[in-house]
């Protein structure tokens, strides 16, 4: 108001409203740039098949909500915010926490332990309280005699399966799995009790570390169940034959002049009782050999088929007139046979998916699912086993088989402490970035060094021990190149990949998978006489002289350069050293490649070559986790 008591008119602003609006508005380009920069800074989530699950041992059954958690009729009375329909809602605290934008999370310092592995989200922990409980449970079992096995099956364990090992003691996964798999299957439910989509058979997941005896853990109960079913089948066949004889007599009395063709009995040819599926033909040969070895004492008919065999050979094995009890095969080959002959899967009572993380992956999942669905009518038990459980497999099992029984060992997703990991920096002198030269130098130093482990006295008398080394590369093309370079440096190296011929693959695997058999007394005497003759002759023959142009070689050392084809399931019990030519892509590959060592309680040594572009922090944390004996989390 002015001096006269009147209202004064508002003054015009010095700046127009349009200019004020433009000055206060934020630039859209700046916001777009901020969003774009944040999207590039934030790391992408890895694929589910490359990330291990954190809840392997937890059941999929949902617990019912308590009465306190349920919303009552007056639950909406005490609201502190107005929840209008058309008004945009702000993001909840849970959504902010999932996105990583929460203010509370910014204040929390990152844990220094396993920081790089958490950035990769390669592994997640299983509660160590659960691991301790499993250790206490399996400590009560110390012998195979505590299992309710048939006497002939128990005798075959010591005479065939574990004849080359000193102590015949069950491993942790065998202590967990054998009692559970020996239980009688659940009774068949009627259509009223179960829906069409719910499986009508028992499901088991065997999750244990590499080299822990998972094959024997499911093979022993299967053979025991097979022999028990044979007794039941003989009794049923005897009763069925008596019933058919009575019916035939009644028909002859009532219709003496009628001629009716009799139905031919259904043969057991091409109708196995137990099917073991593995992803590769190399695993078919390995698992099939174990099944065949046990059949020498426990009488049953077994066979193995893979793409390495001819169609005529496959037909003679599968459709043998005497029948077949246990079949080891790959999924694609078995599915193609089942399309032409559906009766192949009509009598399957036990189905095993060995290396389930590969068989339930995208490449095998449609074929594996088809086999499970076709054999579901007669199936009693479905068994999945693997050393690594990716998040994708865990989610799939919780969705399809929520009632699956999870049998996990305390050392799941861990590398044994008896395996030592060394690191070689190839950027330093004398390598200067030459990875192949560093690999050759490591092999020469290992080959020239003496053997630290005590050898069998008879093997020491027979001759020098041959050291066997595995070299893992990431690319298939580099296997031949690295093997050729090592041969140029005087190292006996061979390449093993999918491009190799089947006969060459079998010969190479036999050298690196079979442990040496103790020699007989005659072989020891021959070796002693030969060594005595060589030392007594004072002459040097022309063929024994070193030629001037001859290259020196590394004696008593064999090297196999391979890809991940030999990292899964291959029982390389004769290998004591593994060299990682490249740093693995994820922790799953670390576990499988280093899992070729330390099998069945033996020691091993691994060397990883680290270059300029490799993740040294990941290698460091893997090494620290191996030293502590913890899971790679």
Swiss-Prot record:
Pfam family, one: DEAD
GO cellular component: mitochondrion
Molecular functions (GO terms): ATP binding; ATP hydrolysis activity; RNA binding; RNA helicase activity
Biased composition (Polar residues): 52-63
Catalytic activity: ATP + H2O = ADP + phosphate + H(+)
Region (Disordered): 50-115
Extent of the transit peptide: 1-38
Domain Helicase ATP-binding: 195-407
Motif Q motif: where in chain: 142-175
Composition-biased stretches (Basic and acidic residues): 98-109
Motif DEAD box: chain residues: 354-357
Enzyme class: hydrolase
E.C. number: 3.6.4.13
Protein localization: Mitochondrion
Binding site for ATP: 208-215
InterPro entries linked: DEAD/DEAH_box_helicase_dom, Helicase_ATP-bd, Helicase_C-like, P-loop_NTPase
Keywords: ATP-binding, Helicase, Hydrolase, Mitochondrion, Nucleotide-binding, RNA-binding, Transit peptide
Residues covered by the Helicase C-terminal domain: 458-633
CDD domains: DEADc_MRH4, SF2_C_DEAD
Entry-linked SUPFAM superfamilies: P-loop containing nucleoside triphosphate hydrolases
Note on domains (UniProt): The Q motif is unique to and characteristic of the DEAD box family of RNA helicases and controls ATP binding and hydrolysis.
Function, as annotated: ATP-binding RNA helicase involved in mitochondrial RNA metabolism. Required for maintenance of mitochondrial DNA.
UniProt similarity note: Belongs to the DEAD box helicase family. MRH4 subfamily.
Name assigned to this protein: ATP-dependent RNA helicase mrh4, mitochondrial
Annotated organism of origin: Aspergillus niger (strain ATCC MYA-4892 / CBS 513.88 / FGSC A1513)
